[in-house]
């Protein structure tokens, strides 16, 4: 399958490498790899970004060992971050809307490919809607992100309300946003 990378005129083939140039003329190379399930559905397993000099700058790896608790490893430059994206067992919301999880399009370097993610050019979305993103090591600031969905009478997602809760030294602060969807 061939998918068009929507920045510039380059083309990507699944399980391949894409190269693009930013406005400053820097070349960035992205390599994608996929987990293919028994139904021949592709799930993005890894994206790696390399700079002009061939040095790895960033990556995201998604472990699908448990589809209700996806393990995400992210590295950007020298910063590494691991988290778990969960949906409660027995209370799953089937992703019949086939939308990607918001955290996927928020994490660099995948944030550079949001249109391709929504277009399913970079693989299928999770089978269940993710309801919580929990960092492994919160350090000084405890943080969780909770996702709440509004569905229409067909079970199609019409909105996702995300709340990022930071707790530091007993002080709580929430950052909220709502993304509305129109799916015909």
What are these regions (language model features)?
Residues 1-8, 12-15:
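Single conserved hydrophobic/aromatic residue that forms the stacking wall/gate
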Residues 9-10, 25-34, 54-62, 77-91, ...:
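A structural detector for short beta-strand units
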Residues 10, 34-39, 65-66, 149-158:
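A short, structured loop/turn motif at beta-sheet edges
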Residues 17-24, 28-31, 45-53, 71-78, ...:
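Beta-turn initiation residues at beta-strand->coil junctions
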Residues 21, 50, 63, 135, ...:
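Hydrophobic alpha-helical segments, especially N-terminal targeting/anchoring helices
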Residues 47-122:
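Short helix-loop boundary/capping segments
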Residues 119-123, 138-184:
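Hydrophilic extracytoplasmic domains
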């Amino acid at each position: 399958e061939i998918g068009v990378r929507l920045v510039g005129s380059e083309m990507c083939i699944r399980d391949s490498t894409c190269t693009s140039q930013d406005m400053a003329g820097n070349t960035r190379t992205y390599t994608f790899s996929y987990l293919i399930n028994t139904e021949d559905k592709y799930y993005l397993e890894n994206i790696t970004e390399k700079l002009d000099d061939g040095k790895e700058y960033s990556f995201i790896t998604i472990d699908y060992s448990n589809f209700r608790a996806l393990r995400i490893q992210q590295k950007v430059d020298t910063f590494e971050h691991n988290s778990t994206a969960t949906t409660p067992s027995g209370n799953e919301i089937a992703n019949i809307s086939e939308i990607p999880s918001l955290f996927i399009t928020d994490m660099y370097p995948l944030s550079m490919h949001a249109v391709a993610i929504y277009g399913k050019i970079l693989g299928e979305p999770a089978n269940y809607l993710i309801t919580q993103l929990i960092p492994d090591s919160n350090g000084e600031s405890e943080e969780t992100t909770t996702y709440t969905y509004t569905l229409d009478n067909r079970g199609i997602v019409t909105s996702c309300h995300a709340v990022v809760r930071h707790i530091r030294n007993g002080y709580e602060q929430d950052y909220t946003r709502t993304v509305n969807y129109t799916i015909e």
